[in-house]
Amino acid sequence: MAVKSLVFRRKFPLLVTGSLLALQPVAALTVQAADQFDCKVSATGGWDCSPLQNANANLPPRPAHTATSVSTAAAGSSVSGSGGETVEAEPTQRLVTESGGRALKSRSADYSHLDWIPREKLTAAQLAEIGPYCGGSYIEPVRPGMDDGAPSDESPTYVSAKASRYEQEKQIATLAGDVVLRQGSMQVEGDEANLHQLENRGELVGNVKLRDKGMLVVGDHAQVQLDNGEAQVDNAEYVIHKAHARGSALYAKRSENAIIMLKDGTYTRCEPSSNAWTLKGNNVKLNPATGFGTATNATLRVKDFPVFYTPYIYFPIDDRRQSGFLPPSFSSTSDTGFTLVTPYYFNLAPNYDATLYPRYMAKRGMMLEGEFRYLTHSSEGIVNAAYLNDKDDHREGFPDYSKDRWLYGLKNTTGLDSRWLAEVDYTRISDPYYFQDLDTDLGVGSTTYVNQRGTLTYRGDTFTGRLNAQAYQLATTTDVTPYDRLPQITFDGFLPYNPGGMQFTYGTEFVRFDRDLDENIYFNDDGSIRGKRPDASLQGLARATGDRMHLEPGMSLPMTRSWGYVTPTLKYLYTKYDLDLDSQGKTDLNKRDESFDSNQDRSLPLVKVDSGLYFDRDTTFAGTPFRQTLEPRAMYLYVPYKDQDSLPVFDTSEPSFSYDSLWRENRFTGKDRIGDANQLSLGVTSRFIEENGFERASISAGQIYYFRDRRVQLPGLTEKDLKRLNLDPSGLDNDSWRSPYAFAGQYRFNRDWRINSDFNWNPNTSRTESGSAIFHYQPEVDPGKVVNVGYRYRADARRFDSSRGTFRYGNENDIIKQHDFSVIWPLVPQWSVLARWQYDYNKNRTLEAFGGFEYDSCCWKLRLINRYWLDVDDDAFLVQSEKADRGIFLQIVLKGLGGIVGNKTEMFLDKGIQGYRQREDQAM
C-alpha cells in the first residue's frame, strides 16, 4: 500500500520518519537503539507503526543491484545477506560507458525506461511533431509538480513509498517499494531510498529516475541533496524530450540551478536503437535555461568511428540562438577555385545579432562578409558589408574595376508612430562585375542591379502620402542605365463622404527622372573589347531626363446585389512634363525632322463600366456533389486617342497579354503611355466547389472586342518607327477588331494533385501567342513526394532592344519554348531521388539539370547531387554566360548539430523544385 503524500518544509524534510515515531505511545520510545519500526498506512490515512523484532521481517525483498551501485553503507562489491553474511554482488547491469553511446536494452527491451513511445502508439498530434522517418518519440509523462516553477529551497518535499523503517540512533530512514521524492519540478524515483536526516541527503538505489522539466535521467544509484535539489546519478542515461535528444554518462550531476553535468558523457539526436552519430566529451554540460550545451575534449563519432575532434564545442539542445560557429560550406568554381566559408554567429542580445562570413577563395584570396541584424519596438533592419583584396588579375584594365572589391548596404524599416513609416533599402558595390565574379551570403535580391531607396510614408484615415528617393546601380555592363527617381512624391486617397453612394478618389504623383549615361567600352570575359556600353545606342527622346506630374481624380457609383454588380467609373488623367535633352538627343531628332518640346502636357478622360453576374447551382459529378458557379463579366472601356510620340518613356512597358489583361484600364504599365481604347471585354468564370468549401476546379475564358484601332504604341513599335528602321509594319497587331482568346484554369484531382494552365490563342494570326501548363503533385499526408511537370510557350514578347535603344517585338530568337521537370521521390524507406531538368527547345540547350539521391533518418541526412546550369535572365531572354557551370554538391546534416557541409545545396533545391520548402518544413 502506498503512503499518502505528506508535505515537509525546508530544513526538516526527513520528518517523514520522525513523525511516525511521534505518533506512538511514549513508552514505545524506551526500546533499544537498534530497534526498528514497521509503519503502514492506517484506515484514517495516518501512520500505524509497531516495533520489529527482526528488522527485515516485513520489508519487501531488496532489489538486486550491480557491483557498481552504491549501497547505503558504502560503494563496494559486496552486500549483506539476510543472515548477515557477506554476498558478492552479481554484475547484472551493463555500464553505459561500455555501450558506445547506445541506449541500454538491459534496462528495458523497448527503451521505455527512456520514455520512448513507438511510432504506432503516438497520437496524431505527437506524430506531427516528429519527422516522417522517426520510429517513435520521447514523450514526457504527466506527473504532479512537473510545471512547478518555485525555487527548490522554497519548495516542500513530497515522499511516498510502500513501506519504511527508521533507525533512531543514526537518524536514517529507509523507504522501500516505488519510492518517490518530489521537490518543486524535480522528482526522483527508485526501488529503495535511505534518507539521512542530519545531512539533508537522500540516497536511492535500483531503477533510479530523476525527472525535471523536459528532462529524464536514468541510473542505478542516485544521491540527492534535499535542501537545494542537487543530485548525482551513476551509470546514467538521459533524455531531453523536446529536443528529441539522449545520451549517457559515467555519472550525471544536477546542480541547484538545474544544469546537468556529465562525466564521460555523450549526446545524440538518434533513436535509442541507432548510433549513427554521437558527440562524446570528457565533461559535458547541458543548460536547459540557455538551451545550449558544451563539451571538452569532444569527439564526433559516426558509426563508432571518430571523424572530428575539438578541445571545446558549443552545441544547441533546443531551438534557441547562441554565439558560435555555424556549419561551414565548401564549393569549387572556375571563377573562385576551391572555396571555404566558415560563418561565425554572434548572439549579442535577444533583439540584435551579427554573423561574420570569412570566405577563403583559392584564386582570389580571403574575403570578409558581415551582417548585423537588429529589432527594436519601432524598427527592424540589417546592416551588411564585404571586402576583398582580389588577387585575381583577370579584369585588370577593365573600366570601373579595382582590386579592392567591396559591398555595403542597409535595410531598415522604422515606424515613427502609428501613421509615419520610414524605409531604407540601400546597397552599393565597388564595380559592375561584383556579382559575376563573387558569391555572397548577404542576401542581395538582384545580381543585375542594386537598389538605393529611401521612403517616408504617412497614412491618414482617407489618404496616403509618400516621399520616395530611389536610385539604381548597375551590376552588369550589358544593360541600359535605369532612371533614378529623385524624388518621387505621391498622394492618393478618397473623399470621406459618399453622396448617393458615389465614391470619389484621387491620385497624384510628382517624380524627377534622371540618370548619368555611361558610354564607355566594355569587354568580353576573355579581355577582348566588345564595344561601347548599351547607353551609347540610346537615341532621341530615349536620352531625355525631366520632371513628370500626374493627376488622376475619379468618381464611381458601385451598385451591388447578391446576384451581381454594376460599377460605372469616370476619371480624368492629366500629365505634365518638364524635360531636358542632351545635345546628342537633339541631334538625333533633327536628323528625323522632329522637334523637341521641353514643356508638354497630356489630358485624357477615361470612362469605364464594369459589371458582373453570379449564378450557382447544385450538381453532381462522378458521384460527388458540387456547387457550380457561373460568373459572367463585361467591361466597357473608353479612352480617346492622343498622340504621345513626343513624350519620353521613363517607366513604361507593355506586359504580355493574359486573362487579367481584359480588365485593365491601361494596357501599359507606368504613366508615360495611356492606351487609347474603345473596347468591350467579355469573360466568364465557372467554379466547382465541394460542400466543405474545397474548390475542385475553375476555368475562365474571355476576349476583348475593339471598336477602334489602337494607335498608341511604345517607341520603336509604331508604324512610323518601323518604316524608319526599314522594317515591315504589316506585323503590327494594333488594327485587329478582337484580341486573342484568353483562357486560364486549374483543376485539383484531389488535395494532392493539381494542374494550372493558361492559354492565349490569336484568331487573327491563327497561332498561339502564349501558354503554360504546370502539373504539381504533393500529398498532404506525405509531402515528401513531389512531382512537377511544366511547359511554357511565349511568342508575344515586347522587349527593349539595347542595341537600338528602342522597344521591338520579339523575334524567333526570343521565343520561349521550355519544359521543366522536377521530382523528389522515395525509392525505399529513407532513400529518395531528387532531380530537375529544364530545357529550352528554341535554342536546343539544357538550362539546368541536376540529379542525385538523399538519405534521411531521424537523426541525420545526406544528399549527393550532380548539377549543370546556365545563368539565364528571364526578363531579357538573355543567357548571361554561354559557358555552362558544373558541380557536384554534397550536403550532410546531423540533426541537432546542423549541416556539416553543403548548405548551399538548399538554395538551388528551393528555387528549382516547387514544393521542396513545404516538404522540408513539414519534415521536422
Swiss-Prot record:
The keyword Membrane applies. One of its GO terms (cellular component) is cell outer membrane. One of its GO terms (biological process) is lipopolysaccharide transport. Residues 1-33 form the signal peptide. Gene3D superfamilies: Lipopolysaccharide (LPS) transport protein A like domain. Residues 66-90 have a biased composition (Low complexity). It is found in: Cell outer membrane. Component of the lipopolysaccharide transport and assembly complex. Interacts with LptE and LptA. Together with LptE, is involved in the assembly of lipopolysaccharide (LPS) at the surface of the outer membrane. This is LPS-assembly protein LptD.
